[in-house]
Regions:
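Acidic-basic catalytic patches of nuclease active cores, encompassing PD-(D/E)XK
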Residues: 89-113
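Short, contiguous clusters of charged residues that form electrostatic/catalytic patches at enzyme active sites
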Residues: 71, 99-102, 172
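Nucleic-acid nuclease catalytic cores
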Residues: 106-132, 136-225
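Charged, glycine-rich intrinsically disordered N-terminal tails and low-complexity linkers that flank
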Residues: 1-95, 157-164, 236
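Charged phosphate-binding loop/patch that engages nucleotide di/tri-phosphates or the phosphate backbone
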Residues: 220-236
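Generic detection of long, well-ordered alpha-helical segments
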Residues: 63, 90-98, 167, 211-214, ...
Length: 236
C-alpha cells in the first residue's frame, strides 16, 4: 500500500504558487540588500538636499551637512547594512510607483525602463550616486505618490523654478540625479489614484538641468567628500 500523500491538482497549484511567491520575496529582499550595500557610505540623490542649505556661504558646510557627512563616515567604517526607515506613506509610494510610471507612459507615449525592482544605482565617482525611479532616452523620472492634499499642491509645479519653491528637497534630488545620470532633463511625476476622476490622478512636469545649481552641488559635494575623508583618517 502506498502511504505517500496524494495531492489534488488544485492543491499542487496552491503549493507551487506559495513556493514561487516565497522565492520572489527572497529575490526581492536580496536585491534590496545589494542596493543598500551599493549606497552604503555614499552621498545619494534622495538626501543630497542636506548639503544644500545656507547657500549664502557656499564654501562652508552648515551643521546639518556635517551631520550627514558623519552618518556616511559611520556607514563606511561599520559592518552590515545601513539603517533604513520606512513609514506607511513611504510604503504607499513604493507600492504605487510602478503604476504611476505606467500611467505616465500611457499619457506621454514615452518608454521608461529601469523601474520598480529593476532600478539601478548609478555611481558618481567613489562617494556618491543616485537611483532613478526610471530612465528613458535623454531623460530620467522621479515619481512621487503623496498624500492627496500634497498632490493638490504638486499640481502647481510646472517647471524647475516651481519645484524649487514648493519642494526644494526634490529639486536638489533631481538636479543631482541629472548630474549622476548625465541627463539634460528629468520628469517630476506626482500620482494619486484615489482621485475620483482619472484625469486628476497624474501630474508631471519637465525639470530642466540648471548648470549653475549643478556647479553648486558639485562644490558642496566635494566639501562633503573632503570632510568625510578627513574624519576617516582619525580612525587610521
Amino acid at each position: 500500500m502506498n502511504s505517500a500523500l496524494q495531492l489534488q491538482p488544485v492543491e499542487m497549484n496552491v503549493i507551487q504558487s506559495l513556493d514561487l511567491g516565497a522565492l520572489n520575496n527572497l529575490q526581492a529582499d536580496k536585491s534590496h540588500e545589494e542596493w543598500l550595500l551599493q549606497r552604503k557610505g555614499k552621498f545619494t540623490a534622495s538626501e543630497i538636499h542636506r548639503l544644500m542649505t545656507a547657500l549664502s556661504k557656499p564654501n562652508e558646510l552648515p551643521v546639518g551637512a556635517i551631520t550627514y557627512v558623519i552618518e556616511k563616515v559611520a556607514e563606511t567604517l561599520t559592518d552590515g547594512l545601513p539603517e533604513s526607515f520606512s513609514s506607511e506613506a513611504m510604503q504607499w509610494g513604493k507600492d504605487n510607483e510602478v503604476e504611476a510610471i505606467e500611467k505616465f507612459e500611457e499619457k506621454t507615449r514615452l518608454f521608461v525602463n529601469n523601474t520598480g525592482e529593476n532600478q539601478k544605482f548609478i555611481k558618481y565617482g567613489k562617494h556618491a550616486g543616485c537611483t532613478p525611479d526610471g530612465l528613458g532616452y535623454g531623460f530620467g523620472a522621479e515619481t512621487k505618490c503623496p498624500k492627496s492634499s500634497t498632490h493638490v499642491i504638486y499640481k502647481g509645479i510646472l517647471n524647475g523654478q516651481d519645484l524649487k519653491k514648493i519642494n526644494s528637497d526634490y529639486y536638489w534630488q533631481i538636479q543631482f540625479s541629472m548630474l549622476c545620470a548625465k541627463k539634460s532633463k528629468w520628469f517630476f511625476i506626482s500620482y494619486d489614484k484615489r482621485f475620483s476622476k482619472e484625469k486628476h490622478r497624474l501630474h508631471y512636469a519637465v525639470i530642466e538641468r540648471n548648470e549653475n545649481d549643478i556647479e553648486l552641488l558639485k562644490l558642496r559635494l566635494q566639501l562633503a567628500i573632503d570632510k568625510k575623508l578627513e574624519l576617516i583618517k582619525n580612525f587610521k
